[in-house]
């Protein structure tokens, strides 16, 4: 029996002893609570994003006449998978950290950013050993989602996403294997870029699954996103104007319950007033993949019916996860076998499943992957950009148990993320505001090696996307939104075809049907106005343009067409005002310049 216990027992009836014990216990409780509050305060200060705070200063700028460092004055954070000299890379796992030495060199990508003038301010929390897309870490805590504090931030690069979303840094680095940059970017309402697989150096980055993963980055500002991309990919600053062909993945947007007027229609409207964009196309990605990736049939669920889009993408994502488990086990099984006796049981289910997986059908897995890259290349060619939802669901609540609902969430999320992971193509996540209290995002995906093309497109379309997203947020919901949106777009496309064929009356009829299905689309009114102008129905054209402006005040075409209608009605002063307004919105518009100059003679 200990001396302390003997003393207590022998003086159990002495009230002074109990006072001492009470004070001692109270002191311990107070100290514990003080420590909790201190930890809580530190987490609130940086949203729980950082694991280690330090400062890596940029390299000295080169002497003139060398160009200025492109990232000068910017700060960034890095996930716990990147080596920093004299620091142990923990891989989001204390057991890993205990069994490894400090890095001898800093990761190449980090050094590249320092050479370009940026300052690294610390390492951020990530999902354990790079697994998962939820963003929770049972060892270090879960970073706080700046947009939805009661919900997960997304992973595996959770801390890096939060550090940008909370405006703690200008940009950050993360790892994207099965969605580790794209998903948290969507959940935190920021930009996230996954480059073409293998195009950014992985030297000094701990591998999870090397044939799937790539270094990715986050930013809130599209210009910063592009500057980082130019530095890491060593891209030319010269921009060649190219045509772009957007292809909407209709079946993938059906996975999401976000109204299409806040996703698909936002993208459509954003490119209508931009030059260099072809008429959008549509594709059923699931059917396209099923038809062009024959090796995938081996992994599809057996049924008497033909495979639908959802089952095809589930099969594709299952192949992706099987490759991830196989490569992770190959990379780290030796460490596990050597150290498991003293590592303890606290590993995530994903890690344990990977380490216990059996390597079956490996050749078939990689055959699917190779066919998938060729399939997406064939679909997109050299100017195609696939438009898909980044995620189908809002971020789950914190500490959600692994149940049927969460498994379905994971299935839908992986069905979307596997397209880029399995093809190796580049993908950017772009925020589009909010629906209710949840963030909305859309992803643009282009062919392997088209990183500069995608970065330039992001910079070109971003401002217009944000304008249209704000307009969409103020519109009243359209009943039966998804169905009516699709039908109205079909009518609009028929109207466009009739217009090109100079069948003006048919065009008017088709546009009228589109308006009946969706009266909140400015383009439908504006297009019908163009057809009315060809029919010399100037008053109807004027009315349609006015309606279009009430929906979209920045619709340049509406001002141009109303100006033309008013000029034809000999209302020169009003017509001139419309053309001047068009020039305010688009100063280099030649049609408006010529018309405004012409009308001066009549006023």
Curated annotation (Swiss-Prot):
Q: Which residues carry this modification: N-acetylserine?
A: 2
Q: Where in the cell is it found?
A: Mitochondrion outer membrane
**Whereabouts are the TPR repeats?**
488-521, 523-555, 556-589
Tell me how this protein sits in the membrane.
Answer: Single-pass membrane protein
Keyword annotations of the record: Acetylation, Membrane, Mitochondrion, Mitochondrion outer membrane, Protein transport, Repeat, TPR repeat, Transmembrane, Transmembrane helix, Transport
Q: Name the residues that span the membrane.
A: 16-32
Q: Name one GO cellular component term.
A: mitochondrial outer membrane
UniProt function note: Chaperone receptor mediating Hsp90-dependent protein targeting to mitochondria.
Q: What is this protein called?
A: Outer envelope protein 64, mitochondrial
Whose protein is this, by species?
Answer: Arabidopsis thaliana (Mouse-ear cress)
In the UniProt record, what gene is named as encoding this protein? OM64
């Amino acid at each position: 029996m200990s001396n302390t216990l003997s003393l207590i027992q022998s003086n159990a009836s002495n009230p002074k002893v109990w006072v001492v014990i009470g004070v001692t216990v109270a002191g311990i409780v107070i100290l514990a609570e003080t420590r909790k509050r201190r930890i809580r305060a530190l987490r609130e200060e940086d949203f729980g994003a950082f694991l280690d705070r330090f400062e890596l200063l940029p390299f000295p700028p080169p002497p003139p006449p060398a160009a200025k460092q492109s990232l000068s004055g910017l700060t960034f954070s890095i996930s716990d998978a990147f080596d920093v000299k004299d620091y142990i890379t923990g891989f989001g796992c204390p057991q890993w950290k205990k069994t490894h030495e400090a890095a001898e060199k800093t990761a190449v990508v980090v050094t590249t950013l320092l050479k370009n003038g940026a300052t690294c301010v610390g390492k951020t929390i990530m999902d354990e050993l790079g697994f998962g897309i939820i963003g929770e870490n049972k060892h270090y805590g879960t970073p706080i989602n700046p947009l939805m504090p009661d919900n997960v931030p997304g992973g595996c690069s959770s801390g890096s996403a939060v550090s940008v979303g909370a405006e703690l840094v200008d940009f950050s680095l993360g790892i994207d294997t099965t969605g580790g940059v794209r998903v948290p970017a969507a959940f935190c309402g920021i930009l996230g870029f996954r480059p073409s697989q293998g195009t950014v150096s992985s030297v000094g980055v701990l591998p999870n699954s090397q044939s799937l993963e790539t270094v990715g980055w986050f930013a809130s500002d599209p210009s910063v996103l592009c500057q980082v991309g130019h530095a890491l990919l060593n891209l030319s600053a010269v921009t060649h104007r190219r045509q772009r062909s957007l292809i909407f993945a209709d079946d993938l947007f059906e996975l999401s319950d976000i109204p299409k007027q806040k996703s698909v229609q936002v993208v459509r409207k954003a490119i209508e007033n931009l030059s260099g964009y072809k008429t959008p196309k549509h594709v059923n990605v699931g059917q396209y993949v099923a038809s062009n990736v024959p090796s995938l049939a081996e992994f599809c669920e057996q049924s008497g019916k033909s495979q639908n889009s959802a089952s095809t993408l589930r099969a594709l994502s299952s192949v992706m996860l099987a490759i991830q488990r196989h490569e992770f086990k190959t990379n780290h099984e030796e460490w596990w076998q050597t150290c498991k006796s003293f590592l303890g049981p606290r590993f995530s289910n994903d890690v344990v499943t990977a380490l216990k997986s059996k390597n079956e059908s490996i050749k078939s897995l990689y055959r699917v992957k190779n066919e998938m890259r060729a399939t997406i290349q064939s679909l997109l060619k050299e100017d195609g950009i696939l438009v898909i939802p980044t995620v189908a669901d809002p971020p789950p609540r914190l500490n959600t148990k692994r149940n049927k609902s969460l498994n379905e969430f994971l299935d839908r999320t992986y069905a979307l993320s596997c397209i880029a992971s399995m093809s190796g193509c580049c993908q950017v996540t772009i925020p589009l505001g909010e629906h209710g209290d949840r963030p909305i995002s859309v992803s643009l995906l282009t062919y392997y090696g088209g990183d500069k093309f995608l970065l330039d497109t992001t910079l070109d379309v971003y401002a217009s996307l944000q304008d249209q997203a704000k307009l969409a947020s103020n519109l009243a919901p359209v009943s039966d939104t998804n169905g009516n949106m699709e039908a109205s777009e079909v009518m609009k496309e028929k109207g466009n075809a009739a217009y090109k064929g100079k069948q003006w009356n048919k065009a008017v009829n088709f546009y009228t049907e589109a308006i009946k299905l969706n009266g909140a689309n400015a383009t439908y009114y504006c297009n019908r106005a163009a057809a009315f102008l060809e029919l010399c129905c100037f008053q109807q054209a004027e009315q349609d343009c006015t309606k279009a402006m009430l929906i979209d005040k920045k619709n340049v075409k509406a001002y141009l067409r109303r100006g033309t209608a008013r000029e034809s009605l000999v209302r020169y002063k009003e017509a001139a005002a419309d053309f001047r307004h068009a020039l305010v919105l688009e100063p280099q518009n030649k049609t408006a310049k010529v018309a405004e100059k012409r009308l001066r003679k009549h006023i």
